[in-house]
Amino acid sequence: MPETCPNTVTKRRCAVVTGGNKGIGFEICKQLSSNGIMVVLTCRDVTKGHEAVEKLKNSNHENVVFHQLDVTDPIATMSSLADFIKTHFGKLDILVNNAGVAGFSVDADRFKAMISDIGEDSEELVKIYEKPEAQELMSETYELAEECLKINYNGVKSVTEVLIPLLQLSDSPRIVNVSSSTGSLKYVSNETALEILGDGDALTEERIDMVVNMLLKDFKENLIETNGWPSFGAAYTTSKACLNAYTRVLANKIPKFQVNCVCPGLVKTEMNYGIGNYTAEEGAEHVVRIALFPDDGPSGFFYDCSELSAF
């Protein structure tokens, strides 16, 4: 259930943040709120969502409310969210698509032991995902890959499509897709996928969907390495590369909008087992900066932290 709101349409700018109950998403909500924006914090778990809002309100962030959103459920919670925003705020100004999953499972106890052996303050820790012995503790399956693409790519598309009519009512609509540097084209090793995603002029949602379907087919048939996909993190890398491509398509499709994607950096979150170069607060700053670009700000770009980056 959503938080109680006044039954009046407000002129205050309104933002929706997916996956807002913890980590980067929570900090994005906090920082947008600090900038005077009315924030609708969303996540799948109702209890965790209410707890997150209560925590924010206890730290004097009153302009935050919760509404449940399951990005894999394109009918029930998305329609309810859209109705809620229309009733209470009349429009939507900012959409931050932050919800995401890693796409692999981890032998947590052994991985934490490896972190401990390296040392939590060691500069080598941020390179742990590159170590073969660490990758051996991580497992990728078709089911996990399917979930990863469903949340990180298809979920973003579904939420965005439902909320576009409300964004169109804004004087300065913005969409920020939280991506990753691993979604850069230089990490897309399947030749067909690279050809499709790298051709910005020919990009369409249908062509991006082709890449998603190719990857899932190869996962199901155990052909990931045979067909040249990344040997580790194929689902996550592809999901973020497809998200970046979708950002480009959307920016071209709706020139009135500011649509950008950003890698917040390797952030010390629960999903990363506390490994990273940035705190959640610092990672969120990279996202919020783009969400609050001036009205004549850029669109259709990829940012790595605060720097403009090639796709």
UniProtKB/Swiss-Prot annotation:
Effect recorded for K186V: No effect on activity
Binding site for substrate: Y129, S180
Effect of S181A: No effect on activity
Entries under InterPro entries matching the protein: CBR1-like, NAD(P)-bd_dom_sf, SDR_fam
UniProt: NADP(+) binding residues: 21-24, 44, 70-71, 98, 236, 240, 267-272
Pathway info: Alkaloid biosynthesis; morphine biosynthesis
EC number: 1.1.1.248
Record Gene3D superfamilies: NAD(P)-binding Rossmann-like Domain
Enzyme active site: Y236
Stated regulation of activity: Strong substrate inhibition. Was thought to be due to mutually exclusive productive and non-productive modes of substrate binding in the active site. Alternatively, SALR may undergo significant conformational changes during catalytic turnover.
Temperature dependence: Optimum temperature is between 30 and 35 degrees Celsius.
Enzyme type, top EC level: oxidoreductase
Reported effect, M271A: Abrogate substrate inhibition. Decreased substrate affinity and decreased reductase activity
Pfam families: adh_short, adh_short_C2
SS bonds (residue pairs): C263-C305
Effect ascribed to mutating L185S: Increased substrate affinity, but low activity
Signal peptide from the UniProt entry: none
This protein's UniProt keywords: Alkaloid metabolism, Disulfide bond, NAD, NADP, Nucleotide-binding, Oxidoreductase
A GO biological process held by the record: morphine biosynthetic process
An annotated GO cellular component: membrane
Family classification: Belongs to the short-chain dehydrogenases/reductases (SDR) family.
Function (record text): Short-chain dehydrogenases/reductases involved in biosynthesis of morphinan-type benzylisoquinoline and opiate alkaloids natural products. Catalyzes specifically the stereospecific conversion of salutaridine to salutaridinol.
UniProt-recorded name of the protein: Salutaridine reductase
Taxonomic lineage of the native organism: Eukaryota, Viridiplantae, Streptophyta, Embryophyta, Tracheophyta
